[in-house]
Amino acid sequence: MQKNNYKPAKKKHLLLTALTSLILISCAVFTLCVYNRSYNAKALEDIRKADSSTGAPVSPPAISDAGGTDNENGTVNPEGSGNKSSASGELHGVWISFFDYNEKGYTRTSFTREAETMLDKCKADNFSDVFVHVRMFADAMYNSKYFPWSRYSSGKIGKSPGFDPLSIMVTEAHKRGLKIHAWINPYRITKDTTSNSALAKSSYAYKWRNSKSPSLRRNVLNYDGRLYFNPSKTQVQKLIVNGVKEIVKNYDVDGIHFDDYFYPYLGTTYRKNFDAKEYNTYVKKCRNNGTTPASIVTWRRRNVSRLIKNVYSAVKSADKKCVFGISPAGNISNLYLNNNYYCDVKEWMGNPGYIDYICPQIYWSFEHPSCPYKKTLNTWTDIKRHKSVKLYAGLAAYRAGISSKEAKAIGDKGWAKSNTVLKRQIKYAQNTGETSGFIFFDYSDLKRSSARKEINNATKLFK
């Protein structure tokens, strides 16, 4: 047979040929690895340069199984913890903010019509949850014992609209099979004024600010042209917790939600401004007791964490099924600056008793120079997370469909290059196996014609 006609010399030749091919392949693989190391070092250096002004976290590009830099739809599995996504179990949410309300207020009929329109749209776009603003500026879009009626309900702060907007929203959301979360800003009192005229005279903010007691006056702080509740004050913490508790007890909400407004940016004089007076009192007490005081940064973080823990406890004591979560700023390095936020998200994520979920606002495209989407999301998935805490991604629907000029103005050209950014962001997050849902900011962009193609491409994944 032909197979028997091969001579030993020819066999040796074939063996040498095979060995040579193997060596060449090995060299090619080695060269590819060296190239990738070189590429990643260069990319890391570029990121460092881009991040030098933002304080953004630095991490190398993700590497795919194929050996090159991971593409936007590639499968990655960064170190993290459980809570894996599943198409059927994901949360698909949208924020309905005070920007979506009418500042002139509503009648029962006009608000009901508005609520029906909003919720019909959310349902049509395959969302499962709505996050509805109920306290924007120490006010209430519901009948509250602790906070005055919002001007977004009646047109004037402290004036009843004659109906209960939150009650209508809860009823209409549940009619459509949507879950509803009451969204609260805990510390913010005013948007751009320090005038007493912006406060309802019946409000705690007004009474404290105009109190004869110096201690009570310190419950409201005037900073950078705005008014804030003092995060360090016990009366403030109790007020915020009571405001949460009444919502969960009186309304069939599915969740309580805080966003990224905690301590304001305090600048280079952060050691001396805002609640520094209360910190100095704390330091004196520590020294009198023979204990070492925490730094002002740690002290402020503890103030916020104490509130978060107390809110969580209040929510669960009122309704164990009701969830509590937070949507902090997406750049985690900024959260740990010495002069801003004071949000110890690693503490909240890594331990039970603080939150049920975290939803960082990752509002950048894949091409952002300092906080590209993949790198930023991976930073969050890498954080140790308790098994009870879910990770969602907050996505920028408001950047969908923007022009090249607009994208250039915000320093994020990736948004103008395609209408599949949100879709690819969702797929990438799902492929990490670490996220459990997404929330879009915000409702108004579901109606914007220039955003529709991008929104449609993304929300088809929610079916």
Sequence positions of predicted segments:
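Aromatic- and glycine-enriched glycan-recognition loops and surfaces
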Residues: T107-D125, Y152-R176, K238, N242, ...
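Polysaccharide-binding and catalytic clefts of secreted carbohydrate-active enzymes
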Residues: R209-N331, Y336-K346, N351, Y363-W364
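Short, acidic/polar
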Residues: G105-K123, V236-I247, Y336-G353, Y373, ...
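Catalytic domains of carbohydrate-active enzymes, especially glycoside hydrolases
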Residues: R113-A140, N250-D254, N351-Y357, T435
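Active-site-adjacent "subsite" loops/lids of carbohydrate-active enzymes
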Residues: S86-S110, A182, Y187-E246, N250, ...
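Aromatic-lined carbohydrate-binding/catalytic grooves of carbohydrate-active enzymes
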Residues: D125-P161
